[in-house]
């Protein structure tokens, strides 16, 4: 009973992270079936904690760069250790480890994620090769972690791997989400953090990034129907929320306020997804 209570407490702690940090993903996860909802929130929580180490919270607390790196390294060690042992005194790590052990999330996904987070402490400007490596570790593997949850949560048997088509779709959706966030945060990344992920300050480059985003979103949309039924509405909502952001980014010059989707539009997108609609495709 104590172990079960601890697991439940860890899951609840992880769920509080997404409620505090993300209206878009928080809205989408509410459309997930109960089989997977808590698991995905636990994945998000670990990702968010690591991101906060490198994106400002640790620095705001007075940690110098070397201490931020040490803290990130310690979180990675704690995570990998908990995945092996099944326990962590860190509630967010414990919740993630329980999900990883059940759903077949292994070090081959976790280590690239932390490698990309570490890059944020070491690299200020990316070329196309380092951009692609960063996006794989910071976003595509997160999509693959969620995919492992979708196909394995609640299974009585050993975890299985998703189909190659679903793997490709998860990667392209994760890449699109990350590139959209890069464009939304271009000024803040440059001014506050001194980072350039895209080199997209020229209009032609910005257009090329948006074209790539649309291609990734369209490719990912084609795979949603192959997901388990209790995951499709949530993925459709997340896809369409970011597709709406991409549309609004294309209409902006990137110099004004951070582009966002108004709450009534978010609600309409979520309602459409909940009704069973397919993801929108720009180039259908």
Q: Regions from the language model: what does each represent?
A:
Residues 1-177, 183-284:
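Catalytic cores of Mg2+-dependent Asp-rich isoprenoid enzymes
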């Amino acid at each position: 009973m104590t172990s079960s209570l601890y697991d439940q407490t860890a899951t609840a702690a992880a769920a509080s992270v997404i409620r505090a940090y993300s209206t878009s993903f928080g809205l989408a996860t509410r459309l997930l079936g109960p089989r997977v909802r808590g698991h995905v929130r636990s994945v998000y929580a670990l990702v968010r904690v690591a991101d906060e180490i490198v994106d400002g919270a640790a620095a705001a607390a007075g940690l110098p760069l070397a201490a931020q790196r040490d803290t990130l390294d310690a979180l990675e060690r704690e995570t990998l250790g908990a995945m092996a042992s099944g326990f962590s005194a860190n509630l967010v790590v414990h919740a993630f480890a329980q999900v990883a052990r059940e759903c077949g999330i292994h070090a081959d996904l976790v280590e690239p994620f932390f490698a990309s987070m570490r890059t944020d402490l070491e690299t200020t400007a990316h070329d196309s090769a380092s951009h692609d490596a960063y996006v794989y570790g910071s976003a595509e593997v997160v999509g693959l972690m969620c995919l492992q949850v979708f196909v394995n949560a609640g299974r009585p048997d050993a975890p299985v791997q998703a189909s190659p088509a679903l793997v490709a779709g998860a990667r392209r959706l994760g890449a699109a989400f990350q590139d959209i966030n890069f464009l939304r945060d271009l000024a803040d990344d440059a001014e506050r953090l001194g980072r350039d992920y895209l080199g997209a300050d020229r209009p032609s480059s910005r257009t090329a990034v948006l074209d790539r985003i649309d291609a990734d979103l369209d490719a990912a949309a084609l795979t949603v129907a192959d997901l388990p039924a209790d995951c499709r509405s949530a993925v459709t909502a997340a896809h369409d929320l970011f597709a709406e952001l991409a549309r609004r980014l294309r209409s902006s010059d990137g110099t004004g306020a951070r582009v966002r989707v108004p709450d009534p539009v978010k609600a309409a997108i979520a309602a459409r997804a909940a009704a069973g609609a397919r993801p929108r495709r720009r180039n259908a």
